[in-house]
Every structure is written in C-alpha cells, then in structure tokens.
Amino acid sequence: MRRLLIPLALWLGAVGVGVAELTEAQRRGLQVALEEFHKHPPVQWAFQETSVESAVDTPFPAGIFVRLEFKLQQTSCRKRDWKKPECKVRPNGRKRKCLACIKLGSEDKVLGRLVHCPIETQVLREAEEHQETQCLRVQRAGEDPHSFYFPGQFAFSKALPRS
C-alpha cells in the first residue's frame, strides 16, 4: 500500500492544483495573499499567479486557516495595476515562489496573515523552516490557547523522597 501512496503523492505534487479547483476559502486566501504581496514597498511591478502548488484549508473554532504554496511571475504592468486583465506575464519576467498562511474569521475577516514570496533562486532550507514556524503562529491566531491539548503541556514528575 505504501508503495502506491508515494508515487501518487509525487504525481499530485507535480500536477499541482488549478485555480478552478480551489475552495471558496482558498480563493479568498489567495486574493488576500496577492493583495498583501502587492502592498509591499520593494515590489514595483505587478505579478500574476501562474500556478498553485498546494492549497489546504483547515477549520478551527475561530475561523478557517488557509495554507497556500503558489508561483508568481512578473507582468508588463506596474504594481498599482496588478488587477487589470490586460496585464500579461512577461516570458522572461522574474519568478517568485510563495508561501501564504491566512487565517480567515467570520465574514472573511482576516485574523492573521503571512505572505513570503522570495525570488525562486533565493529559496533556502533554513528560511523555509522559519516560515513554517511563522505559519503556525498565523494558524493559531484568534484561537483560545487553552482549547488545545499539546503533549507535555500538563506533564508532572514525582519528586524523589528526601533521604
């Protein structure tokens, strides 16, 4: 069974997720991520999403946590015009690989967000681990810290008798 699951997982990872296949929460998360990316001051050109590598939404008591991995490519438009349909992807434009962690509350209120889109050549292993830690913080946004049990949270040890 395990032999079948590994090739299936590799195939699904290579195929990716189309934008049409995203849930409503995932589409909203992608929209929030693109808005956040284009607000960033160093970004001067508009970027367009070219593919969604993975998309997961998880319900929590405070809202829905959406984790997205997607790719962006530079367009011929300036960043203020990023929503315009006439913005076409530049064939040799810069490419970015993004990780977005968005926590949506009731009525799509954004409780927390993390959008990290380094240029594809700058992706480092240590940076990915750091981003995962920040992503977990976004995942817990708006949640009651006492509503979850974490192993070791209530660990006690019996003291040795005094001799």
Curated annotation (Swiss-Prot):
Keywords: Chemotaxis, Differentiation, Disulfide bond, Inflammatory response, Secreted, Signal. InterPro entries: Chemerin (IPR029562), Cystatin_sf (IPR046350). Residues 158-163 form a propeptide. The keyword Disulfide bond applies. GO terms for molecular function: signaling receptor binding. Expressed at the highest levels in placenta, liver, and white adipose tissue (WAT), and to a lesser extent in many other tissues such as lung, brown adipose tissue, heart, ovary, kidney, skeletal muscle and pancreas. Within WAT, expression is enriched in adipocytes as compared to the stromal vascular fraction. Expression and secretion increases dramatically with adipogenesis. Highly expressed in skin (basal and suprabasal layers of the epidermis, hair follicles and endothelial cells). This is Retinoic acid receptor responder protein 2. It comes from Homo sapiens.
